[in-house]
Amino acid sequence: MKGLFISGSGTNVGKTFVAQYLIRLLSNTLKVSARKPVESDCENKNGRLIPKDALLLSKACNINEPIDKVCRYKLESCSSAQMASQDSGLKLTLDDLVDACMSDEFVIVEGTGGLLSPIARQALNSDLIQALDMPVVLVIKDELGAVNQALLSINSAQSCGLSISMLVLNQIQPNFLKNAQAIKQHTDIDINVFNQNHLASFERKVKKILLVI
């Protein structure tokens, strides 16, 4: 199964935003499906749990799949996927999540939280990435402290034997922190600032990634 796994340094760093853009970009030349195998903090609407991130990913795709296929495990508790599944009485396993990611098309998989966030019994996001054997797009929010977050995440990924295709510095607000320059002094991983002024460069690098997947 070919695809990319979107992970990050934590929650609310822009994984879904970057994943949406990747899906739309790749959909110009490929059939692309999206998977968010488990999502916590889902909104309860009349007894039905609504996975907000998964819905955004689904809308970005050029193929129409049921939301239950995009996100198989929807959880209400606002906590890690592991704890939220326990709160709901669900005994979620790594094998369950691997199966929930399967697709016949090129697939963009978005994890929950950071690389080492627990997502099932005795399983972290890094374990799911290993099981899927996918390269990682690592999203870091471009803010004060991003250098530390990036290097910690890179070290974690490498210690788990994961392949990082690209590190994305998600620049939500323009700044002059020069985080990309600082990170480049400590790693050979491809680093890309993600904002409206750097989209052409981002797209070129994504196309290069596709050549080696």
UniProtKB/Swiss-Prot annotation:
GO terms for molecular function: ATP binding; dethiobiotin synthase activity; magnesium ion binding. InterPro entries: DTB_synth_BioD, P-loop_NTPase. The keyword ATP-binding applies. Its cofactor is Mg(2+). ATP binds at N12, V13, G14, K15, T16, F17, D53, E110, G111, T112, G113, N170, Q171. GO terms for biological process: biotin biosynthetic process. The active site is at K36. It is an enzyme of class 6 (ligase). Pathway: Cofactor biosynthesis; biotin biosynthesis; biotin from 7,8-diaminononanoate: step 1/2. Its main location: cytoplasm. Keywords: ATP-binding, Biotin biosynthesis, Cytoplasm, Ligase, Magnesium, Metal-binding, Nucleotide-binding. Its EC number is 6.3.3.3. Substrate binds at S40. Mg(2+) binds at T16, D53, E110. Homodimer. Catalyzes a mechanistically unusual reaction, the ATP-dependent insertion of CO2 between the N7 and N8 nitrogen atoms of 7,8-diaminopelargonic acid (DAPA, also called 7,8-diammoniononanoate) to form a ureido ring. This is ATP-dependent dethiobiotin synthetase BioD. It comes from Ruthia magnifica subsp. Calyptogena magnifica. The lineage of its organism: Bacteria, Pseudomonadati, Pseudomonadota, Gammaproteobacteria, Candidatus Pseudothioglobaceae. The gene is bioD.
